[in-house]
């Protein structure tokens, strides 16, 4: 909450706003991290499934790329 002096001097309460924004940003990052950590098994499964679909030896290489 801004202090009562903010109405008189707006520059005096800028640090309060900055601290609140940093705190809010850290809370958002923490919550995103919790969601990722909670669903990490599902994410790892999706990554593994996507990696299995990559062929080891491509029958039709991209035109212009030669070994």
UniProtKB/Swiss-Prot annotation:
Its main location: membrane. This is Systemic RNA interference defective protein 5. Changing residue 43 to P: In qt34; induces defects in RNA silencing. GO terms for cellular component: late endosome; late endosome membrane. The keyword Membrane applies. Residues 1-18 are extracellular. Residues 40-67 are cytoplasmic. Keywords: Endosome, Membrane, RNA-mediated gene silencing, Transmembrane, Transmembrane helix, Transport. The lineage of its organism: Eukaryota, Metazoa, Ecdysozoa, Nematoda, Chromadorea. The chain crosses the membrane at residues 19-39. Disruption phenotype: Defective in RNA-mediated gene silencing. It is a single-pass membrane protein. Ubiquitously present in most tissues tested. Expressed in the somatic cells of intestine, muscle, neurons, somatic gonad and embryos but not in the germline (at protein level). The gene is sid-5. One of its GO terms (biological process) is regulatory ncRNA-mediated post-transcriptional gene silencing. InterPro entries: Sid-5. Plays a role in RNA-mediated gene silencing by mediating transport of both ingested and endogenous dsRNA between cells. Not required for the uptake of dsRNA from the intestinal lumen. It comes from the Eukaryota. It is found in: Late endosome membrane.
């Amino acid at each position: 909450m801004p202090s009562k002096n903010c109405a008189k001097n707006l520059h005096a309460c800028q640090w309060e706003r900055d601290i609140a924004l940093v705190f809010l940003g850290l809370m958002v990052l923490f919550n995103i991290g919790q969601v990722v950590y909670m669903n990490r098994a599902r994410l790892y499964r999706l990554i593994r499934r996507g990696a299995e679909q990559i062929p080891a030896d491509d029958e039709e290489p991209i035109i212009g790329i030669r070994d």
